[in-house]
Design a protein with these regions (language model features):
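Short glycine/serine-rich loop segments
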Residues: 1-72, 253-266, 270-273
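A short helix-breaking turn/cap at a secondary-structure junction
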Residues: 31-118, 122, 141, 297-309
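Short helix-loop capping/hinge segments that flank enzyme active sites or metal/cofactor-binding pockets
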Residues: 95-104, 152-207, 223, 258-270
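Acyltransferase
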Residues: 114-138, 161-170, 192-213, 291
Length: 309
């Protein structure tokens, strides 16, 4: 799709699988709120566990914000096979006055590439020139939110899927998987229950945050796109990628929030995108902000095509 083959693609996202490809390829996407787009996999051998349902979302990818918005409207239609689908309007009330955007303050322990800092500043400037009010603000406990995501998803996979996955996959996959596991706590039943309870605490904190700042501007990845085999180098490298580079991606899944990714710039020939995160079922606010950035940054794939010509 980024190369011009097809106009709209369909993906899903439980830890970044819509937003990370969009970032790497210079296209637009939105991970909708959990329950916005119905999902049903008729070929699945068994139902997914509850938290996998609550952290996963189906969504569109396209070359422009307008195409993503149109695709989301089509994909959001009711399907009775998904008991988690929610009938909520795609457009909500506009916040009063200029919309306040929180430019997420990056944690002190994050290794952030200067090109990402520059892209975030450019996106913030684009929003301000479009009438938004942007302030750098610390978002609620991004480290704790990410750890809750990691603990829940890794432990669910270990219990229900790990043996089957390892039996049919390569040593490279085993390296990548063990790198992901390295950052997770091993949970017994009481630990898993505490982790799922913590999810509600985190969501409440973010919902209160959105009362003051309806949109959050955050990085997709804080480091340049890695090489094609970076996830096979070592389990330590994989663990670092998930914790450092992609922390702001996966944390949003456990919150169930809508998050759009829009490309901002090229750095050494590679696209850099940013996330626009909004409150539950406020995909419209995230996409409006993404459209404001796109209006000034342009449709990035056109620059990529010129570069490749």
């Amino acid at each position: 799709m980024a190369a011009g083959i097809g106009t709209i693609a369909h993906g899903n996202d439980i830890g970044g699988s819509l937003r990370w490809p969009a970032h790497c390829n210079g296209v637009v996407t939105i991970k909708p709120t959990q329950g916005r787009v119905p999902a049903y996999n008729q070929s699945a051998a068994a139902e997914r566990p509850m938290l996998a349902h609550l952290m996963s979302a189906q969504g569109p990818l396209a070359r422009s914000v307008g195409d993503v918005r149109m695709a989301l409207e089509v994909m959001s239609q009711r399907d009775p096979r998904d008991p988690w689908w929610v009938a909520v309007p795609l457009v909500g009330p506009k916040p009063k006055g200029p919309i306040k955007v929180a430019l997420a303050k990056l944690p002190d322990d994050m290794d952030v590439d200067p090109s990402v800092h520059a892209a975030l500043r450019q996106a913030a400037d684009d929003l301000e020139r479009s009438g938004y009010r942007v302030s750098e603000v610390e978002v609620p406990d991004i480290n704790g939110v990410w750890q809750t995501w990691c603990d829940i998803i890794i432990n669910e996979v270990v219990v229900l899927q790990e043996a089957g996955m390892l039996a049919v996959t390569s040593e490279d996959f085993h390296t990548a998987w063990n790198g992901m596991k390295a950052k997770a706590s091993t949970l017994d039943l009481s630990g898993w229950m505490r982790a799922t309870a913590a999810r509600s605490t985190h969501i409440r904190a973010w919902q209160l945050f959105f009362e003051d700042y309806p949109v959050v501007l955050a990085p997709t990845s804080v480091m340049p796109t890695p090489g094609p085999r970076a996830d096979t180098e070592s389990l330590e490298r994989v663990a670092e990628m998930f914790w450092n580079d992609l922390r702001f991606i996966s944390a949003i899944n456990v919150l169930g929030l809508p998050s759009a990714v829009v490309p901002v710039a090229l750095h050494e020939g590679k696209p850099i995108g940013v996330q626009l995160i909004a409150g539950r079922y406020r995909e419209d606010l995230a996409l409006d902000a993404a459209a404001s950035i796109e209006k000034r940054a342009g449709v990035l794939v056109q620059k990529l095509w010129q570069q490749m010509a």
